Amino acid sequence: MDNIIGGQAQQVEDTDGTRVQNEFSKFLKSFKDQKNEFIYKSAMKELVQPEKNTIFINMQHLYKFSNNLATTIELQYYRVYPFMCEALHLATLDACDESERQQMFKKQLYVSLFNLDAKTKVRELSADKVGGLVRIAGQIVRTHPVHPELSRACFVCEDCGVTTRDVQQQFRYTQPTKCANPQCMNRTRFSLDVNSSTFVDFQKIRIQETQAELPRGSIPRTVDVIVRGEMVETVQPGDKCDIVGTLIVIPDIAQLSTPGLRAETSNQNRGRATDKSEGITGLKALGVRDLTYKMAFLACHIQQTESLVGGDASGAVEETDYLDLWSKMSTEDRATLKKMSDDKKIEKNIVDSLFPNIYGNHEVKLGVLLMLLGGVAKKSRDEGTSLRGDINVCLVGDPSTAKSQVLKAVEEFSPRAIYTSGKASSAAGLTAAVVKDEESFEFVIEAGALMLADNGVCCIDEFDKMDLKDQVAIHEAMEQQTISITKAGVKATLNARASILAAANPVNGRYDRSRPLKYNVQMSAPIMSRFDLFFVLVDECNEVTDYAIARRILDNHRAISEHTERDSVYKIDDIKKYIAFARCFKPKISDKAAETLVREYKKLRMSDSNNAATSSWRITVRQLESLVRLSEALARLHCGKEVLVEHVEKAAELLNKSIVRVEQPDIALDDDDFDNNIMVVEADKENQRGDDSMDHDGEKENAPKIDIAKLKISFKEYKQLSDVLVLHMRSDEDNQGEDEYDGVKQSALVEWYLSTIEADLETEEDFNVQKTICERVIHRLIHQDHVLLEVEQGEDPTLCVHPNYVIADE
């Protein structure tokens, strides 16, 4: 008792902790891996570097070394962790040189444990897990700024000046119980010596349980995770992570201001004269009476779940060079990627392996694959303007055409993907919201779907159901790939470097093929121009296709995996590694590819300016950038360092299929503007002429009569006839030479056409019908479509082809 009164109380030695410290020290010094190397000895030598303070221990190595030691650490982790850190500190000092020991003596070191077998769901974290080592998984929804935390404090007594060192701080400011000087009776008046105290990096992260762990009808739960040392700033909002650590219980400091505590404090101080100023009252009574506790997760190791080749996720991999990534791969991975890159049918094989449950729609699947690969992001030399490399894709079509299925498949496959619905999402939910922090009461930015999908894919279903004001909010994110916020005193520009995969339904439920795309979807022109690819999925009645789709669906319901084995040439993990490796390539555009790009863009512009074209929406310079991005993605797909002509042609073909996919109505060639000697009458009105027929002159009476229905041709027939006439005129021009060519007479052109189809003309009426159709098609090409030009006007004009006219799919 005299020892307790006169000086410090005697501390009880933790024998179990000391035993763990000794055994863990032996493990660090003597453990050898499969290559018979002391891996942890070399790791301890690296701790001398100023930025290193954590050693990473594989739990399987601990079990292999001593099952008893590993079990003790797993069951009593929070109790023995300080002893493990002390063992690491002493072992590191032994491994250091004399010059390095002084530097390492005051350094705070940490032990990070990973590769724990059992995984606990966030919902299962309860009081029985407190203090034990557990592994949880979740998605990061918020990260707080990194700030210094007082780890070991050094206090100076204000009465006698004696210094008390190494006072451990447990999540709150903790002073010594009494002065270290036995003659000094001070218990409260201490000042902190900042220079002699130890501070460490501290960050709080909030994770949310994943959808796979979510029970039916439940709301996702969140838990606060505390990370220190090298673990800070290793993850970002949106990452799916595996976290190893322990569940701890900490006092809820925010509850100190509850009415019950204020009343208690005022009763204690009532009638007591004191001039001591206090900040937060009630700190001495932490854990007493109506103060509540809250749970938090103290992490010792955190890493992204979807780690790819080289140990990084897709967003980080793209920043590295492909040669560096290749050097980090295992021999098995190298062989697999080499085999895939040499595959001549890699497009089809990867597409079939990615979407085994979706039948057909090869172009759609290829477009989604190119979106996952992406183009090369660039910055202009002079202005420094950023040019996005991500590809945006929109799927428009009838119900039950597997649009949402494609989105779900991408969400499951992509390492960083967010799935959301347009109708259930607001502008703030898609971009970012400003909310008040529950502890600091300051306004902080809460990441939205596009921020969470940074360096990934944001899948937006029911895109057409979004309100117009919400669509406007993502204009900036889709083109500049940033989100600007100015609200509640917070002004920030945030990154949203995500590809957008959207699905939309037509206006009236079914796609009207007789109308252009812009009239079939409820989207503004600025939004439509920001999509690189538009795919129209029409539910057509086709016996062969319907049978194949029905067979595929029934196979899925009957749990028959034959189609999966047949279609899946590659494993999903291999495809992930291949895409991550391919994204490291930054292909350059060759001179021939640049010429092809210009030529294909001019084709698109000419088709858009032509009234007879089947363009879905306005072709702008953004479509040229889309061509560049798609060409780069195709080059990446083949792991190419250069964009070739075939890549550009394939990209142009894909863009054409997504743009020019509108059926035009039949064309009626029965206008009254034509001046010819053929009288067009309707069959049901022939007998109603009566006395009116007496008014016609001799020429008109002798003119042949043609049924109006026979002068109605489909748009496809019209295009075929116009292309035949244009090709004939251009061949004449090539044969005669540009200098000698004067054009073709209309009558000669009609006669040539009739001579080519002479074998199909059986009656005089057929001859008159085809002649009239040809003349009226020529008239439309001159006056309406402006494909042909009149060199000489008159009853029989001389014609030539417009020099800028380009035949589609020539």
From Swiss-Prot:
Example GO biological process: mitotic DNA replication
Function of the protein: Acts as a component of the mcm2-7 complex (mcm complex) which is the putative replicative helicase essential for 'once per cell cycle' DNA replication initiation and elongation in eukaryotic cells. The active ATPase sites in the mcm2-7 ring are formed through the interaction surfaces of two neighboring subunits such that a critical structure of a conserved arginine finger motif is provided in trans relative to the ATP-binding site of the Walker A box of the adjacent subunit. The six ATPase active sites, however, are likely to contribute differentially to the complex helicase activity.
GO CC terms, sorted: MCM complex; nucleus
Domain MCM stretches: 346-554
Other comments on record: Early fractionation of eukaryotic MCM proteins yielded a variety of dimeric, trimeric and tetrameric complexes with unclear biological significance. Specifically a MCM467 subcomplex is shown to have in vitro helicase activity which is inhibited by the MCM2 subunit. The MCM2-7 hexamer is the proposed physiological active complex.
Catalytic activity: ATP + H2O = ADP + phosphate + H(+)
GO molecular function, one term: ATP binding
Entry's EC annotation: 3.6.4.12
Sections of the chain in a coiled coil: none
Organism: Caenorhabditis elegans
Subcellular locations according to the entry: Nucleus
Binding site for ATP: 397-404
Keywords: ATP-binding, Cell cycle, DNA replication, DNA-binding, Helicase, Hydrolase, Nucleotide-binding, Nucleus
Protein name: DNA replication licensing factor mcm-6
